[in-house]
Amino acid sequence: MHYSFTEKKRIRKSFAKRANVHNVPFLLATQLESYHGFLQEDKIPSQRKNEGLQSAFTSIFPIVSHNGFARLEFLSYVLGDPPFNIKECQQRGLTYASPLRAKVRLVILDKESPTKPVVKEMKEQEVYMGELPLMTSTGSFVINGTERVIVSQLHRSPGVFFEHDRGKTHSSGKLLFSARIIPYRGSWLDYEFDPKDILFFRVDRRRKMPVTILLKAIGMTPEQILENFFVFDDFALHADGAEMAFVAERLRGEVARFDITDKAGKVLVAKDKRINSKHVRDVEAAGIKNISVPEDYLLGRILAKNIVDKETGEVIANANDELTEDLLARLREGKVTHIQTLYTNDLDQGGYISQTLRMDDTTDQMAAKVAIYRMMRPGEPPTEDSVEALFNGLFYNADRYDLSAVGRMKFNRRIGRDELTGDMTLSNDDVLAVIKILVELRNGRGEVDDIDHLGNRRVRCVGELAENQFRAGLVRVERAVKERLGQAEADNLMPHDLINSKPISAAIREFFGSSQLSQFMDQTNPLSEITHKRRVSALGPGGLTRERAGFEVRDVHPTHYGRVCPIETPEGPNIGLINSLALYARLNEYGFLETPYRKVEGSKITDQIDYLSAIEEGRYIIAQANATIDKSGALSDELVSAREAGETILVSPERVQYMDVAPGQVVSVAASLIPFLEHDDANRALMGANMQRQAVPCLRPEKAFVGTGIERTVAVDSGTTVQALRGGIVDYIDAGRVVIRVNDDEAQAGEVGVDIYNLIKYTRSNQNTNINQRPIVQVGDRVAKHDVIADGASTDLGELALGQNMLVAFMPWNGYNFEDSILISEKVVADDRYTSIHIEELSVVARDTKLGAEEITRDISNLAENQLARLDESGIVYIGAEVTAGDTLVGKVTPKGETQLTPEEKLLRAIFGEKASDVKDTSLRVPSGMVGTVIDVQVFTREGIPRDKRAQQIIDDELQRYRLDLNDQLRIVEGDAFQRLEKMLIGKVVNGGPKKIAKGAKITKEYLDDLDKYHWFDIRPADDTSANALEAIKESIAEKRHQFDLAFEEKRKKLTQGDELPPGVQKMVKVYLAVKRRLQPGDKMAGRHGNKGVVSRILPIEDMPHMADGTPADVVLNPLGVPSRMNVGQVLEVHLGWAAKGLGLRIGEMLNAQVQIAELRKFLAAIYNESGKTEDLDSFSDAEILELAGNLKNGVPFATPVFDGADEGETRRMLDLAYPDHIAKQLGMTASKNQVTMYDGRTGEAFERTVTVGYMHYLKLHHLVDDKMHARSTGPYSLVTQQPLGGKAQFGGQRFGEMEVWALEAYGASYVLQEMLTVKSDDVNGRTKVYENLVKGDHVIDAGMPESFNVLVKEIRSLGIDIDLERD
């Protein structure tokens, strides 16, 4: 068993019963692969597949001019290097993007050529096509300086769908069937039955028309239409009746309208009897081929063909005419002996198409097309050309109609064709085939489709969404190019004169910047990032809307199994519309979700793993992952629980064809992080999964004692941690950098084998949380490829650590944990367990106004000296300054116009001169309620504006830091090269060298030490190999130096060039504050099982309930929060966490007692190897065992995987191991070791009942009271009503609503009520009067008329009622 460097340091004991047969795939693969498929940036043009950008270009090009003598052809495209890296884009507020250039060829044909067209001239050129945003390695985009995610969309797959209205449309409850052909791009074609069983069609949900109009428009005659939809009855006409060709099947179930006799005249079926199977057999046995029928049997039947008089050529009757006595007489006159009628019945062969044809008054193909034209373009006069163009453009033109490969595959599969490929447009056969199936459905044969089946919904990922936008932009370009191509020949234009890239840039910018699917990345913690990128939304353009989505779409469907998580979805209006991908799910080539299964052959489980889509899964019988397997790998139960076509069944093992790969394959990443999920109610699990995403990273992350084993995968895949790209030995570390000397076998020849990893330090995330990486390796450690070498936010030794392990006691305490309130020990706050750092970005811009430019300066009047002390000479705050609300961060003055001066201002003007009056102070100040430390300042200056001293100093510091960084890198690189050189040279024979070394002498270490290192290259080894290697290393060092010099120059150029700022902005200053948030009453906290609450009180440690040995609880929770919520998982977590801590304490005691290593190994083996997954501890050296034990002494981490976790017996065994009887007695534990006698900290008396105590991983959520607490005395007022604005963001007031007024009325508090409704709200004159009275020292309220009353009066006047106040 292989352990990575960090896994060895702390092994998580797993209780999994089943071996891991299939690793969890890379969690961000969906996003990265999709966008990579779109760009195909690493492939040479000739090897690119026809998808993504390539497909968009080839679908639009070549563009041909209107006269056909000029065309523009696409050859290839190339993506340039992005001008700025990700970090620079974030700082400057730019988009991380690459310039796209397309190589196009303009071909002009010779108009004068008498024969076929001859090429007159060709011009090739690379044309700029705009910028394409690039995806970062973690699957996000940097757009205008902020990280965004493009959420995948779950939409209805293109293809054909058959459904009915479930009897809701018509009062009789009759099922009305309909079909819809949905293309990827183009017009929708709907077919629908009405209550009278007439079949209609509509295009793009316009007015409905009889379907036979469409059939005529595609060139079918009424005869052909009837032939396609009906079978015919043949009749031979006689003078006094007729003879019907006998078809036995058609008679069964009919009521005989006459006696049926055999040749001898024996009655086989009497009149008015229902014909059954026996009757049919009798008739067949009698050898009857034709049956004589009376005249009235023909009446009312429908003719199948036109009947023409053979002599005159006159049409006697048309197809679809009803037979009447008159018509029969005419037929006999015309000597017609043979007729065919439609066979219909009321049960399973309705005459729907015939009835529809009767409604249709169009006569021929052209008339039908004109009718469609009038429906599509009402009011426009139809001409033959326009009618043809419109009809052919609807479904038959590849430019306007695209079914897509998915649509064609789904279409062909649904209508029963074998081949899954074909044209991307509709054919006449397609149109007809859908109508045939719809008629069959109405006749009672076949099944309608389930729209919510995941075989009918597909996922559109980033790549596909971006491709659609790019194509839309290209289409706009195409129109412009077509017009200009005509002039290309005359004006001698080049390709770049024809193509304007603006429409493309606009389409791309609009999509990434403001599309509903382009979302501001949730960056609270690593889990929220990863979940956001794995989200699948049914909303967005081309999707559903919240209001229209019904219950069925939102519900969990059997096909979600292993594809979409049934648990993780938001509460509220989006429930069920936004989902998360299941852990193992992936997309197939068509965009359908697939999940892996193990192949089972003859009840034997094989190692073959197949990914099945929802469509394929329906054909197989699939067993669950927890089915019992014997030692030979076969299913051992007599009956196995399995799924077939969405139903759970019990089957014999031989019938099973597949088996789940893992018990947790049903759920998403967030849900799979909840231990004992199987014991939680689904609603609470949903809250638990959602709340983990809101956990704020703590100052010191702590791994969960009870996890599920997937924490490491999440931390690594999220990109928060730093992984080694190649194996090697750690050469150097500091807080911001790790340097690894690469193993010889992994380093490439001639390359300098050093990898340098720069860590992210104290960076602001999108949610203002702090992102900070810290190294977890030491100098000299040997690491392998992909080992974790640095932890990020919310990770501990390469594992996700969202919260802290708290000692929890379930007991009431003086009402402080009533209704989910949480009582917390002061020790938790004192130890900074839940302290988090938040980084706030405050910015100020200096604009060029009409009255003159704003100025950032230290010279501000009326600013106190203690405020000025924090500002430097440029007026910008120092780094490291501790600031509180109202402190000035950046001094700024704005010119103001000449206004009427107040007497006070006149006085100031007289004293201080001009300056005081013509500018006003608009400095950047710390907002209310914020206290923090300035950690960074950035100054951006527009090109051409002189930089102030602070801006120049920031640039100089940055360059100096970069130069030191490069020098360090060079030192490390050279040191490594000289080490390799020394190894290679010692003992080699030389031909000569510095310090007059003799020819044939061997190089010694002393000789090399005596030489200056750069003179080593002057040594001339005798063998050519060494000489070449020496030369190669010399060149590689020179090359590296050259590269570093170039990099420094590039950096200097970037820093010294002006910044791109919005129009009118001269200068921008950004100040970053680090705010420390400690836990306080009002903060929201939660466990992982949906058990949320608000901190009600922080209690001194001496008052907390404690155990017999004096250990106080950290958190006291209300036991009543568990039973009704049915999230028992939290109690099981507490028991197992209690064991985890106890085992850690036992290991700590052993280490303190310095026991023999063998004894320590024995104890570790008892923990790890007696149940669940076993660990190979024998492969560990003694030093590694000691390091492992040292990391375990705070608690042994457990993994209890979802649906495959620890059972009661295992938990008890761990408790027995952790708390031997003598220790249990000291702690006052019960015999079962899962409860403890607690003592009141205030009185020292024991509580009446034993209490469940243990460790729970508890999280602090992002709903912090600091962000919500807000107070105001005076502030902004609404313009219309003059009432205070609402909300913290507007610095608003607290609404005193209707019910609050009732409360004051109930108490009779009339004065309070009066001031609430007048001076504290919208009595403008009253407000100013209160100020005046207060200044005079007179505390009297003069209430006047509230402004809202005036608004009411105005509103009534607007209705035309003259209302006025009677004034005394």
UniProtKB/Swiss-Prot annotation:
Catalytic activity as recorded in UniProt: RNA(n) + a ribonucleoside 5'-triphosphate = RNA(n+1) + diphosphate
Gene3D superfamilies, per database record: 2.40.50.100, 2.40.50.150, 3.90.1100.10, DNA-directed RNA polymerase, beta subunit, external 1 domain, DNA-directed RNA polymerase, subunit 2, domain 6, RNA polymerase alpha subunit dimerisation domain, RNA polymerase Rpb2, domain 2
MF term (GO), any: DNA-directed RNA polymerase activity
The family this protein is said to belong to: Belongs to the RNA polymerase beta chain family.
Cysteine pairs bridged by disulfides in the record: none
Record InterPro entries: DNA-dir_RNA_pol_bsu_ext_1_sf (IPR042107), DNA-dir_RNA_pol_bsu_external_1 (IPR019462), DNA-dir_RNA_pol_su2 (IPR015712), DNA-dir_RNAP_su2_dom (IPR007120), DNA-dir_RNAP_su2_hyb_sf (IPR037033), RNA_pol_bsu_bac (IPR010243), RNA_pol_bsu_CS (IPR007121), RNA_pol_bsu_protrusion (IPR007644)
UniProt source species: Janthinobacterium sp. (strain Marseille)
EC number(s) stated in the UniProt entry for this protein: 2.7.7.6
Keyword Transferase: yes
Cross-referenced PROSITE patterns: RNA_POL_BETA (PS01166)
Lineage: Bacteria, Pseudomonadati, Pseudomonadota, Betaproteobacteria, Burkholderiales
Complexes and interactors: The RNAP catalytic core consists of 2 alpha, 1 beta, 1 beta' and 1 omega subunit. When a sigma factor is associated with the core the holoenzyme is formed, which can initiate transcription.
Broad enzyme group: transferase
Gene Ontology CC: one annotated term: DNA-directed RNA polymerase complex
Pfam families: RNA_pol_Rpb2_1 (PF04563), RNA_pol_Rpb2_2 (PF04561), RNA_pol_Rpb2_3 (PF04565), RNA_pol_Rpb2_45 (PF10385), RNA_pol_Rpb2_6 (PF00562), RNA_pol_Rpb2_7 (PF04560)
GO biological process: DNA-templated transcription
Function, in words: DNA-dependent RNA polymerase catalyzes the transcription of DNA into RNA using the four ribonucleoside triphosphates as substrates.
Protein name: DNA-directed RNA polymerase subunit beta
Domain of life per record: Bacteria
Presence of the UniProt keyword Transferase in the record: yes
Keywords of this entry: DNA-directed RNA polymerase, Nucleotidyltransferase, Transcription, Transferase
